[in-house]
């Protein structure tokens, strides 16, 4: 009789996500979702609150921050509702998304900082708002990069 060897595994297990909302927000890498959303919200709100003097620069910042906010919100909802269990390559998708978003956010952060430097001599209140937007943009960049590495190594 021929021996029945089990075939090698050809798929990856879905990520082990803790059950419950509180447990989800307290474990790495999933704890990065809420700060990413909050600080990303502050970026596009602060940029939109100023007079957009440089539409090409700050338009890219608004596009990256708003799109990243919405897609990250969809990722969070998919973790909360368990949609990730249906896909085998969810961990790779999550890591690629957050890595790509970290790179795009870095470009947006540099452009926002440049727009802040240029606007220094104009309206002082808009300058301070641009400084805050630059700070939150760099902070959000760091969070997205940390999330990408932590989901990759998790």
Swiss-Prot record:
GO cellular component: clathrin-coated vesicle; cytoplasmic vesicle; Golgi membrane; membrane raft; plasma membrane
Positions of the MARVEL domain: 24-154
UniProtKB keywords: Membrane, Transmembrane, Transmembrane helix
PROSITE patterns xref list: MARVEL (PS51225)
InterPro entries: MAL, Marvel, MARVEL-CKLF_proteins
Membrane-topology descriptor: Multi-pass membrane protein
Similarity section: Belongs to the MAL family.
Protein name: MAL-like protein
The species this protein was found in: Mus musculus (Mouse)
Lineage: Eukaryota, Metazoa, Chordata, Craniata, Vertebrata
Gene expressing this chain: Mall
């Amino acid at each position: 009789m021929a021996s029945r060897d089990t075939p090698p595994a050809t798929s990856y297990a879905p990520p082990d996500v803790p059950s419950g909302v509180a447990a989800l927000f307290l474990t790495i890498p999933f704890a990065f979702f809420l700060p990413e959303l909050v600080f990303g919200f502050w970026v596009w709100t602060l940029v939109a609150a100023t007079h957009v003097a440089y539409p090409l620069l700050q338009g890219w910042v608004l596009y990256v921050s708003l799109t990243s906010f919405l897609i990250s919100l969809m990722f969070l909802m998919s973790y909360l509702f368990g949609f990730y269990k249906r896909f085998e390559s969810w961990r790779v998708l999550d890591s690629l998304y957050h890595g790509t978003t970290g790179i795009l956010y870095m470009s947006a952060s540099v452009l926002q900082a440049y727009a802040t430097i240029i606007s220094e001599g104009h309206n002082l209140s808009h300058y301070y708002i641009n400084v805050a937007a630059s700070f939150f943009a760099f902070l959000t960049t760091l969070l997205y990069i940390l999330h990408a590495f932590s989901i990759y190594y998790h």
